[in-house]
Amino acid sequence: MSDRLTLLRPDDWHIHLRDGAALANTVGDAARTFGRAIVMPNLVPPVRNAAEADAYRQRILAARPAASRFEPLMVLYLTDRTSAEEIRTAKASGFVHAAKLYPAGATTNSDSGVTRIDNVFAALEAMAEVGMPLLVHGEVTRAEVDVFDREKQFIDEHLRRVVERFPTLKVVFEHITTGDAAQFVREAPANVGATITAHHLLYNRNHMLVGGIRPHFYCLPILKRNTHQEALLDAAVSGNPKFFLGTDSAPHARHAKEAACGCAGCYTAYAAIELYAEAFEQRNALDKLEGFASLHGPDFYGLPRNTDRITLVREQWQAPASLPFGDFDVVPLRAGETLRWKLLEAEA
């Protein structure tokens, strides 16, 4: 078993960098490992057009560490009022790479999201025409649907219809959490892919709920039962190019997580590739990590692969108990625990 693993530099195809003072921390954590990242647009107010995307992009670039070549790939936030013209303008910008469908109320800062899928059909048609991928938070939000069933329900009620109606539209089913989602993506046409988080590969709902409620495991879509975790691992290590890395690293200040009504999100960017390495090692599949982390994503998006490399070494180190997060602190996933892989260096 090798104690050293060298990969083409990976990208993160789903990350939350937040805004304001927090960028000084989140951008550096992402840039430590990733060449590029698809940056989620669910700010307050959200990133709804190319001008807002450019302003946010400039704030991210200003927070890059010295000499970093990290590239933020910007995303529009779809609303009921997003027009086909806004899609075309965003595509022409060269820096907006996708548009994100949040069902209204599904997750953090999604109140401005789409209330009915049909309301964005004109935008989706324009996206298909110009070659802009649709990123989907795949959960229904009706109160009568159990939180553990909302992903499967979204597939049956909405996603199948979107894929059938727009056969040339690239669709990324983001942060999939169920065997149902993995099967849907496998069986869908080649224009449908999915991201998988490290925390959904490493953990299931027992880790969050057994022996006490652990708020730093709470995320949306929520962790599912262990059989779904195993199905996600099967997909990630399969070598199927439809599945690729997306951390959904989503920081919240400690007081917003450790609360009577805590926020959803796990902060993993500080050690993302190390966490994925642990998951792949569980399946004796470290040879599949480069495809998942570095190749499948850019290939799906039609972007060039990175050419520089990173190196991981098998070395135990202790995750920090907390990290700075603007004016506050954030408790990262695995805080205070031992990690088994460590990012060593970048190679030209």
From Swiss-Prot:
PTM-bearing positions, type N6-carboxylysine: K100
Binding site for Zn(2+) 1: H14, H16, K100, D248
Enzyme class: hydrolase
Free-text cofactor note: Binds 2 Zn(2+) ions per subunit.
Record function comment: Catalyzes the reversible cyclization of carbamoyl aspartate to dihydroorotate.
Subunit structure: Homodimer.
UniProt binding sites for Zn(2+) 2: K100, H137, H175
Tree of life domain: Bacteria
Needed co-factor(s): Zn(2+)
Similarity remark: Belongs to the metallo-dependent hydrolases superfamily. DHOase family. Class II DHOase subfamily.
Pathway membership, UniProt: Pyrimidine metabolism; UMP biosynthesis via de novo pathway; (S)-dihydroorotate from bicarbonate: step 3/3
Entry keyword set: Hydrolase, Metal-binding, Pyrimidine biosynthesis, Zinc
Enzyme Commission number: 3.5.2.3
Binding of substrate, residues: H16, L17, R18, N42, H137, L220, H252, A264
Gene Ontology CC annotations of this record: cytosol
GO BP: 'de novo' pyrimidine nucleobase biosynthetic process; 'de novo' UMP biosynthetic process
Protein name, UniProt field: Dihydroorotase
Annotated catalytic residues: D248
Any Pfam family: Amidohydro_1
Recorded catalytic activity of this chain's protein: (S)-dihydroorotate + H2O = N-carbamoyl-L-aspartate + H(+)
